[in-house]
């Protein structure tokens, strides 16, 4: 299972255990701009707090505590930052596992797929005005 899927599933499970209703339809995971903020970050506590009638920071803290008690695969640290962002730190074992998968798949097997094979595509270049903002009308 992908580490992102593992984290997402764990977050949704903990939110359900905490009684957050309605559960978010998606859990957005992003790579933080600052490496000190972990390997992955989510704003799910901020997004869910209003509907749950809770303070985002407190919800994030509860989420982090529950996730630390039973961490998802490869997660070694969970912390709350700012108004309720939840940051995840991954173990080096995650990178080792991914690299082992890449080596095992070989040159011809890793990140290759047949999507779009045999399909013709037309590539157009828009004539955008360099002095103004780019918008949908430039694609005509």
Per-segment meaning from a language model:
Residues 47-51, 97-140:
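N-terminal catalytic cores of NTP/NDP-binding nucleotidyl/phosphoryl-transfer enzymes
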Residues 60-69:
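Short, well-structured alpha-helical segments that form the helix of a local strand-helix-strand
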Residues 68-105:
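Structured, non-catalytic alpha/beta "coupling" segments that mediate domain-domain communication
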Residues 12, 45-46, 64:
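Amphipathic alpha-helical segments within well-ordered protein domains
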Residues 27-43, 76-87:
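Short, charge-patterned binding micro-sites
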Residues 36, 41-60:
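Short, small/acidic-rich helices and loops at N termini and domain boundaries
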Residues 1-29:
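Charged, compositionally biased N-terminal leader segments and the immediate start
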Residues 23-31, 79-82, 117, 121-127:
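Conserved alpha/beta enzyme-core scaffolds, especially Rossmann-like or related mixed alpha/beta domains
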